[in-house]
Each structure stands twice: as structure tokens, then as C-alpha cells.
Amino acid sequence: MNVDCIGPWTVTANNGAKYTFSALTCIDPVTNLVDIILLDGSNPRADYCGERFEICWLSRYPKPNRCVYDNGNEFLGRGFQEILAKHKIQGKATTVKNAQANGICERMHQTMLNVLKVHAKTTTIDDYNGARHVMEHAIASCIHATRIAVNHTMQHTPGEIVFQRDMLLDIPVIADLVAIRERRQLLIDEN
């Protein structure tokens, strides 16, 4: 499991009011399944991030053995660390020497930023609820896009691997996880 915070983004309503949001991104590095959790405000606290991680990821998906995160206070703080300890998940902060260890999250953030820009420019926003609505729709679009994108290494979409169904057509998909693991290792060895 890789987690990271993205944002803050300021959404401006028609009346000039500004609303700030950020998000918690969660990616399973085995399947590349993504979930994105909307957070209020620009500087989320560790207890808030931990609570949202527990409610939005741990309540829906199998418990990960390990959680990789950067050195931000939202992950190193007591609240987030308590959630990891409660669920017996090994926390692993990236180091200065290996800052790219959480690169899987960082690459997805650029996709999300592009989606958010389009939604913010093409939607009328009147108030906080409208701003939140834009953010939720942009996040849903980004989640869907990442789940239906064919991964070069896996030769399947993350949605196909996790749900064993095509994400667009109503047909079953059987992915050979052993072959995927071997293909990944081969690519690593070649580089």
C-alpha cells in the first residue's frame, strides 16, 4: 500500500468565495488499484488522514501488510501511526536517499491535477456544496480513468485484476498473476 496527500487546491465560486481541498491517494502496488479520498482543507492533520484512510480504504479492501508514505506530518503524526498500529500494518516512510519509493503515487497525481482543472473550468460553482461536488466528480473521474487504463507491464487494467471483470464490457477476465509477477521481474532485470 502506498499513500500520499495531494493538493491543496483552491476552488473559486462564482461569487469569489474560495474553498480549499486536498486528497489522500491510496494505491495497491501489486494490482495498481487506486482510491482517492477527498479531504477538507489544505493541511490535513495525522488523525484526520488516519481516520479517512481507515474509513475509505481499510473498510473496503483487504488489509495491507505494509504502508509506504512520505515524511509529511500527516503520516508521521500520532493519529495516522495509531491507525496503522491498530490494524497491525507496518508503516514505512520513504527516506531522503530513496524519495522515489512512493513514485507510484506521485505519477498518478499529475493525472488527477489535469482532471481537476477540466472539471473546475467546465462547472458552475455557487457555494461550498458546489465546490465539493466538483471535487467529488473530478476524483471519481480520476479513479475510473486509473482503473480502466491498461498497464503496460501487467497487460491488464487494475480493475480487471481486482474485480476479475472488464471495466467497460460485461465479460469475465482471468489474469495470470504469476505471469504478471514474472513479467515485472523481467523488466526490472533488463533495466
Feature roles, as predicted:
Residues W9-T10, L33, P44-A46, E74-G77, ...:
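Flexible loop/turn segments at secondary-structure boundaries
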Residues M1-D35, D40-G41:
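An active-site-proximal beta-strand-loop segment
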Residues N2, T25-C26, I36-L38, V68, ...:
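Structured core elements
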Residues F80-N191:
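Domain-scale segment recognizer with a strong primary affinity
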Residues Y19, I36-R60:
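Active-site beta-loop-alpha junctions of metal-dependent nucleic acid enzymes
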Residues P62-L76, G91, T95, N102:
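Acidic/histidine-rich, metal-coordinating catalytic segments
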Residues V34, Y48-F53, V68, G77-F80, ...:
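Extended, hydrophobic alpha-helical segments in both membrane/secreted and soluble proteins
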Residues T31-D35, S59-R66:
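Short, surface-exposed connector motifs at secondary-structure boundaries
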